[in-house]
């Protein structure tokens, strides 16, 4: 190649003089920076100390949210890159808005007070939930509108499951283990409530908040059982006792 390009005399070529150097030889200061002067900056994280820490944290967070959106959409294995890109952007924008609202409206913006149902002081989580629940509904509506534009109902459910780490299936499985011979009607009601919880929960930033939303709908499920001939407290007690007996039996083996 070089002989052709530079018009070299091929008779003078001597391949014995050709050496192949490892890539690491190109690193002037060693492969891992071993030859760098003492005190030299070795990572971008150290450079960040000289910049706006809040802005740097947001940049890192943005990158993390973007990766999350990309990974979630990639799991759908869409054949249309344009639709996939649109879905990624919709999810990324929603995740950012949820994060920004949460960070800009801390629990301290909610006055201390009592829970009117229990009479107990509002917890930090209670106040976080109140603050975050005030996020404009348009944020949620925009996400769902955009997802419906490019995804099927089944694909949207898969994305919502990503937001809530599969809590619908996990919680339903728990009810099926606790409630003896759970009927089709009961299963339909429980699944309906859990899906409502899932869609509401995507507008909250962390797992404690997501779990708190699911607790609201789990309470409705348990009230449903009590109102339709079941005794939730007794069923749960029986389930716990059964599990304890099973563990004892396994321990004796």
What are these regions (language model features)?
Residues 1-57:
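Alpha/beta-hydrolase-fold serine-hydrolase catalytic core, especially in secreted/extracellular enzymes
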């Amino acid at each position: 190649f070089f002989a052709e390009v530079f018009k070299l005399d091929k008779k003078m070529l001597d391949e014995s003089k050709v050496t192949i150097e490892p890539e690491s030889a190109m690193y002037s200061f060693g492969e891992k920076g071993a030859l760098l002067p003492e005190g030299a900056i070795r990572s971008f994280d150290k450079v960040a100390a000289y910049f706006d820490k809040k802005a740097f944290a947001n940049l890192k967070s943005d990158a993390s949210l973007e990766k999350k959106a990309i990974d979630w959409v990639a799991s759908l294995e869409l054949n249309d890159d344009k639709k996939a890109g649109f879905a990624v952007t919709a999810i990324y924008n929603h995740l950012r808005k949820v994060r920004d609202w949460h960070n800009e409206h801390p629990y301290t913006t909610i006055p201390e007070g009592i829970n009117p149902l229990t009479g107990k002081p509002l917890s930090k989580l209670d106040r976080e939930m109140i603050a975050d629940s005030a996020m404009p509904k348009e944020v949620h509506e925009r996400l769902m509108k955009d997802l419906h534009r490019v995804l099927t109902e089944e694909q949207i459910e898969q994305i919502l499951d990503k937001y809530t780490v599969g809590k619908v299936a996990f919680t339903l499985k728990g009810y099926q283990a606790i409630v003896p011979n759970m009927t089709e009607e009961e299963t339909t009601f429980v699944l309906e409530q859990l899906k409502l919880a899932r869609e509401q929960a995507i507008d909250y930033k962390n797992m404690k908040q997501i779990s708190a939303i699911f607790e609201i709908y789990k309470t409705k499920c348990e009230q449903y059982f009590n109102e339709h001939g079941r005794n939730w407290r007794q069923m749960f007690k029986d389930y716990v006792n059964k599990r304890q007996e099973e563990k004892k039996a396994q321990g004796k083996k």
